[in-house]
Structures are given as C-alpha cells and as structure tokens.
A protein has these predicted regions:
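Conserved HGGG/HGGXW glycine-rich cap/lid loop of the alpha/beta-hydrolase fold
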Residues: 18-66
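An N-terminal hydrophobic leader/cap segment in hydrolases
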Residues: 1-4, 16
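Conserved small/polar residues in nucleotide/adenosyl-binding loops
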Residues: 128-135
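Active-site loop/oxyanion-hole signature of alpha/beta-hydrolase fold enzymes
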Residues: 58-101
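Active-site acidic short loop of glycosyltransferases
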Residues: 22-23, 49, 94-96, 119
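A short loop-to-beta-strand scaffold at the N-terminal edge of the catalytic core in hydrolase folds
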Residues: 9-18
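Conserved hydrolase catalytic core segment
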Residues: 99-127
Length: 137
C-alpha cells in the first residue's frame, strides 16, 4: 500500500493505492463513517490480483483535512461532490472507466456519484454489513 495525494478542483485528497496488474480495471473504495481508506487494507490488498485499487480518506478522516468546500450543514452531499471530483481525476489519470465500491455511507456515496458521472463509471458495489478488520477472502 502506498499513500498518494490527488489534487482536484475541490481540494487535495489523501488516498491509499494498492497496485495490481498493469492493465487491470481500476477500483475505488469509499470508507464508512468513522473509518478511513487504510482501514480496509486486509480486504483491498487481496483484490490486487484483479484490480488496481484506490481508497480515499474523505474530508475530515484519515489524512485528508476538511477543506474550503467542506459542507458542515450536509456533509454527505458535500462528500458526494468531493468523491465525484476525485473519480474524475482518476478517470483522467487512467483514461478508462472506474469501478466504484464502498462500505456503508461509502457505498451510498459511490452510488450517488455513479449517477452524477455515469459515463466515467464501469459499475458500483455497495456493502452494508462489512467488518473490514475481520474480513478474509
């Protein structure tokens, strides 16, 4: 796992990156409330057999600070715009559609974003009852 900073028009986001095969699909994983991207290390590193995996730290979690665009009235809506900006940058970087996944609110954010920018998304997966620290594949 490697930490990266990805710059977007809504600020800088700290993301975890697990490298998979050279031409593997790109998966972005969005964490649940109270977690950060690195929480899912045990799960996501195993997915590198088939994917290049990114997992962000949403604003105010992990290593991403609440930026100028942080929406304290409706943080879920604000985070959906932040995630959209991040996915647009990943799409530009890799020049292909991104598969979105997430746990709990991260899954909901991923579904919201997939509707905003469906032309940049290859699909989405949402998990509600995942205990990431105990997950084994």
């Amino acid at each position: 796992m490697k930490r990266l900073t990805i710059k977007t028009d809504r600020g800088d986001f700290s993301v975890c990156f697990w490298k998979g095969p050279a031409n593997a699909p790109i998966l972005h994983w969005a964490h649940a409330n109270g977690f950060n991207g690195q929480t899912y290390n045990r799960l996501l590193r195993k997915l590198t057999r088939d994917f290049n995996v990114y997992a962000w730290d949403a604003p105010g979690y992990g290593m991403t600070e609440k930026g100028a665009f942080y929406n304290k009235v409706n943080p879920v809506l604000g985070n959906s715009y932040d995630l959209e900006a991040l996915i647009i940058e990943l799409n530009k970087k890799h020049k292909r559609k991104i598969l979105l996944g997430g746990h709990s609110i991260g899954g909901s954010l991923s579904l919201m974003v997939s509707k905003y920018i469906e032309e940049k998304i290859s699909g989405s997966v949402s998990y509600t009852h995942l205990r990431a620290h105990e997950t084994s594949l």
